[in-house]
Amino acid sequence: MSAPSAVQTPSRPKMDTKTMVSIAMLTGIAYIVMLLSKLMPSVMFLDFDFKDVVVCIGGFTFGPFAAAIISILVAFIEMLTISHTGPIGFIMNVLATCAFSCTACFIYKKVHSKKGAVLGLACGVACLVAVMLLWNYLITPIYQGLPRETVAAMLPTVFLPFNVVKGGLNMALILVLYKPVVTALRK
């Protein structure tokens, strides 16, 4: 007679206490960076927000799942505290940050090198641009009350350059800051 077989359930990746504390700390830092970014002038409803730098560094360090967690937490805290955009802004915020950060972190996890970081970040910028162009085309007419034709005309002249510059600046900052920050986080 054979022993009863135990049913094995797929295990989730476990986070140790240090990882959870680091993610919480990075969430707080990302929120502060987002607050400081709000001090910069904005054009229409487009804001440069450098929290993606912190989110992506967290993802490079702890993986794409951590980047998604940090992104969701920061966007949720922002929605509850200072945002005037409500759930639509929350969704847009999470989509933009995850499109950039999770894409970059996933590729970096697979190709763990400087080349992988650059490739991941470049793909993250491309994903950010694609997602935000689609989101702006679909939601901005509803949210801002603009005719869809007006928004469609703004895609190549306003939204495309804005998101390319935003993604490019975030990419440059990450490439400069990643090694020193990661060295400090791993201590």
Predicted regions and their residues:
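Loop-helix junctions at membrane interfaces
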Residues: 1-187
